[in-house]
């Protein structure tokens, strides 16, 4: 038994290092060199093919515009303040209850202040009334960064924060700022006037993508009360001259147009679901994405 065990251990040691043949794990130094060289060349070629394929693919992709733009979903509609569970609940006589909503609006509108839009090399005035789309050339850097249209806070009226730093919350008349999410190259197509006959209160303009808010359910519609809309030129929507958006590389300071709605007569102590929708020929809605082209928010003004 002892001899067999010693013989077995000796055979393993000899396999690991054979001093007679100068072999390590059954191979000589030259053999190990050849096999290592083979694998270095083999995997080097694989890496080269992979890198080359990636480089060729990158040559077909623009860093300024997606290749398959037609597969991008329509933009979503978003409200500010953005609160947990999209609920706004507060007491007008309790500043702490609405402080977070006010802070959210203030922070968002910081970049819309006049001081932030002073640089004439970046910003330009695009008019005080809605107008047609403002094309700024191809999506490349041949012309460098593109200019950005200024957006004045004063166009948001009672919801601008210029005259009321609480945006109506201290009076129980909360403001909600509405924006259309950025989609590179998106060109809004406003609906035809006749398609808005269902909403006679909407102020129509062929150069505005309109937005309308109403109660989500029948019982909500009775409790929403009156609403005041604010936007460029007095139109509740997004003027076309702010589109298309050219992306972060070409328009790093881009300001999307805003509008605001103020709920001036909400039924007190009642949770009201309100839905706001953008209307346009290329605005879509999805049951899977409740923010695509619309949003709904619950608002409760407590006594």
Swiss-Prot record:
Annotated localization: Cell membrane; Apical cell membrane; Cell membrane, Sarcolemma
Segments crossing the lipid bilayer: 35-62
Top-level taxonomic group: Eukaryota
Residues that bear Phosphoserine: 11
Post-translational modification: Glutathionylated. N-glycosylated.
Annotated region (immunoglobulin-like), positions in chain: 191-303
Glycosylation sites: 158, 193, 265
Disulphide linkage map: 126-149, 159-175, 213-276
Single GO MF descriptor: protein-macromolecule adaptor activity
Membrane topology category: Single-pass type II membrane protein
Side of membrane Extracellular, spans: 63-303
Phosphotyrosine found at: 101
Gene Ontology CC: one annotated term: organelle membrane
Topology Cytoplasmic: residue spans: 1-34
GO BP: ATP metabolic process; cardiac muscle contraction; cell adhesion; establishment or maintenance of transmembrane electrochemical gradient; innate immune response; intracellular calcium ion homeostasis; intracellular potassium ion homeostasis; intracellular sodium ion homeostasis
Keywords for the protein's UniProt record, in alphabetical order: Cell adhesion, Cell membrane, Disulfide bond, Glutathionylation, Glycoprotein, Immunity, Innate immunity, Ion transport, Membrane, Phosphoprotein, Potassium, Potassium transport, Signal-anchor, Sodium, Sodium transport, Sodium/potassium transport, Transmembrane, Transmembrane helix, Transport
Keyword Transferase attributed: no
Subunit structure: The sodium/potassium-transporting ATPase is composed of a catalytic alpha subunit, an auxiliary non-catalytic beta subunit and an additional regulatory subunit. Interacts with catalytic subunit ATP12A. Interacts with regulatory subunit FXYD1. Interacts with regulatory subunit FXYD3. Interacts with NKAIN1, NKAIN2 and NKAIN4. Interacts with MLC1. Part of a complex containing MLC1, TRPV4, AQP4 and HEPACAM. Interacts with KIRREL3. Interacts with OBSCN (via protein kinase domain 1). Interacts with TRAF3 and TRAF6.
Family statement drawn from the similarity comment of this UniProt entry: Belongs to the X(+)/potassium ATPases subunit beta family.
Entry remark concerning the domains of this protein: The C-terminal lobe folds into an immunoglobulin-like domain and mediates cell adhesion properties.
Stated role: This is the non-catalytic component of the active enzyme, which catalyzes the hydrolysis of ATP coupled with the exchange of Na(+) and K(+) ions across the plasma membrane. The beta subunit regulates, through assembly of alpha/beta heterodimers, the number of sodium pumps transported to the plasma membrane. Plays a role in innate immunity by enhancing virus-triggered induction of interferons (IFNs) and interferon stimulated genes (ISGs). Mechanistically, enhances the ubiquitination of TRAF3 and TRAF6 as well as the phosphorylation of TAK1 and TBK1.
Protein's recorded name: Sodium/potassium-transporting ATPase subunit beta-1
Species the sequence originates in: Sus scrofa
């Amino acid at each position: 038994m002892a001899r067999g065990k010693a013989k077995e251990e000796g055979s393993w040691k000899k396999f690991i290092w054979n001093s007679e043949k100068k072999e390590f794990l059954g191979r000589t130094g030259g053999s190990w060199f050849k096999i290592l060289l083979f694998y270095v060349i083999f995997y080097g070629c694989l890496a080269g093919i992979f890198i080359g394929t990636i480089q060729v693919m990158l040559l077909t992709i623009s860093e300024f515009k997606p290749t398959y733009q037609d597969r991008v979903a329509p933009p979503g509609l978003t409200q500010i303040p953005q609160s947990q569970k999209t609920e706004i609940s507060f007491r007008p006589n309790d500043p702490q209850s609405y402080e977070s909503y006010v802070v959210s609006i203030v922070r968002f509108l910081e970049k819309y202040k006049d001081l932030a839009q002073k640089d004439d090399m970046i910003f330009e005035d695009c008019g005080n009334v809605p107008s047609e789309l403002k094309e700024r050339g191809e999506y490349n850097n041949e012309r460098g960064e593109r200019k950005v249209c200024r957006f004045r806070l004063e166009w948001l009226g009672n919801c601008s924060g210029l005259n009321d730093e609480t945006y109506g919350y201290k009076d129980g008349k909360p403001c909600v700022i509405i924006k259309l999410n950025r989609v590179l190259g998106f060109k809004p197509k406003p609906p035809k006037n006749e398609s808005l006959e269902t909403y006679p209160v909407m102020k129509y303009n062929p150069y505005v993508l309109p937005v309308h808010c109403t109660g989500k359910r029948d019982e909500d519609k009775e409790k929403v009360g009156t609403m005041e809309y604010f936007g460029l030129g007095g139109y509740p929507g997004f003027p076309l001259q702010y589109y298309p958006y050219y992306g972060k590389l070409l328009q790093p300071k881009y300001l999307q147009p805003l509008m605001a709605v103020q709920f001036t007569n909400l039924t007190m102590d009642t949770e009201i679901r309100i839905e706001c929708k953008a209307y346009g020929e290329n605005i879509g809605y999805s049951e899977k994405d409740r923010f695509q082209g619309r949003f709904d928010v619950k608002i409760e003004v407590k006594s």
